[in-house]
Regions:
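Short glycine-/acidic-enriched loop or helix-start segments at secondary-structure transitions
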Residues: 22-24, 50-52, 120-122
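Active-site microenvironments of hydrolase-like enzyme catalytic domains
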Residues: 107-111, 116-123
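Glycine-rich beta-strand-to-loop/alpha-helix junction loops that act as flexible
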Residues: 13-18, 111-115
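N-terminal glycine-/serine-/threonine-rich phosphate-binding loop
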Residues: 1-11, 29
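Ligand-binding beta-strand-loop-alpha-helix segment within the catalytic cores
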Residues: 34-110
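Glycine-rich loop at the start of a catalytic domain that most often binds anionic cofactors/ligands
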Residues: 18-33
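Short glycine-rich or small-residue beta-strand-to-loop segments that form or flank ligand, phosphate
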Residues: 10-14, 41
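Class I SAM-dependent methyltransferase SAM-binding "motif I" and its flanking Rossmann-like core
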Residues: 120-133
Length: 133
């Protein structure tokens, strides 16, 4: 509804599970749904031993996965601008929070708990998050 009305729609999305993305891409393309007012905030990304995002071409890279399996498969005239695809950035740890707040919050949040019960790599019993739980 928001998108059809030309309003901004903000999603928080995981990379796992990934089964929804082929259906999403197919529907966007078949129904010609413009994502020009849509923002995707990915919850997490792997870092290497130097606390840098792993290589984009790695099969483990969430940025790479989203690019290859989602954004590249959506028709160019429908896909959102690259600046509307937000990932955690170790150089700017508040980027997600500040950008999300600047947009007025999220409209939709999908999550996929990891095998330990974590969400966005935050373990359920992490002491540093106890006050926020």
């Amino acid at each position: 509804e928001r998108n059809a009305a030309g309003k901004r729609t903000v999603f928080i999305v995981p990379v796992g599970p990934v089964g929804q993305y082929p259906y999403f891409v197919q529907r966007v393309n078949e129904e010609r749904i413009s994502l020009k007012n849509v923002w995707f905030f990915n919850m997490d990304e792997y870092l290497d031993e130097h606390d840098r995002p792993i290589d984009f071409d790695s099969h483990l890279s969430f940025r790479g996965f989203m690019h290859r399996e989602v954004y590249q498969k959506i028709r160019k005239e429908l896909v959102m601008d690259a600046k509307q695809r937000i990932f955690p950035d170790p150089d700017h740890p508040r980027l997600l929070t500040e950008t999300l707040e600047g947009l007025g919050g999220a409209d939709v949040c999908y999550c996929g708990p990891g095998w330990t019960g974590h969400l966005a790599f935050i373990e359920p019993d992490a002491p540093e998050f106890a006050e926020q739980a």
